[in-house]
């Protein structure tokens, strides 16, 4: 049995992306881990590359080829086959720092935590130099201690999962992610909290909020573990005709976890930022097919509908950041 299980869902990733990702995993200082690669119905070329690269870079690994069912089902399948005490997820086009598993092991051996969070940093694809990034991360964040979260800390982290706003969970350009990445989750907890396969968008935030709704022991290491590579052809960076529908699905899933005034304000802050992004990424995009007049009417109609209107209480304004207040005046007033 391995101490860690690294689960990598893959769907038609490029060979170079996977090679960089797999290489960063093979360079881990701590070696007691297994790798489970879930091929979520990739084309034949990608499937062959997965098999070849897994054999090249990994010692203990398992490749599972399935039909395309989405990333949530792929991750759940990985959880099913994992044998490690703790599970961590890595996307097939990202890279991790060599100290990640060693850092986690040293803390988890000392404290019986359900979840241990590390730091993630976003890097644009055109700035990518894998060896340089890993070396900088290792030197810059050489020393770190675990911040064990009390009830107040867990509440702060819960709020952070709505809008990534809490300074306690940031360090330089690094931050605790709302995705499943850059964190170690006890296998028994992951098995009881599988990803919602019905959600096609916003499944990451929903999963994190659900995990934190459990009575858990958690800690945070303010050390860079993970590089999220922002790629131009990523689904998150392409024009989507279903942009509004997908974000409505995501925000609706998050709204279910609003439990008090503070989380309501964090939800409002997140919805305001989505509304801001809606203008350049959808209505003002060169691919938008409608007229500007139609866009104006549709946009202002959205503001009055759920989930965009949720949390839109004038009493919440005082809790927003300066940027949030400006966005509120622009989009909600």
Residue ranges and their predicted role:
Residues 2-5, 26-37, 58-62:
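Short loop->beta transition adjacent to catalytic acidic/histidine clusters or analogous donor-positioning motifs
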Residues 13-27:
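Short, well-formed alpha-helical segments that are part of the catalytic scaffolds
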Residues 21, 66-82:
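Glycine-rich, basic loop-to-helix element that forms the pyrophosphate-binding segment
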Residues 39-50, 91:
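A conserved acidic beta->alpha catalytic loop
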Residues 67, 90-92:
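Catalytic metal- and UDP-sugar-binding loop of GT-A-like glycosyltransferases, i.e.
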Residues 87:
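Short aromatic/hydrophobic "clamp" motif used to bind/position activated sugar donors
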Residues 95-108, 113-202, 206-218, 229-242:
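Donor-binding/catalytic cores of nucleotide-activated saccharide
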Residues 284-333:
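Membrane-interface aromatic/basic loop that binds lipid-linked glycans or pyrophosphate carriers
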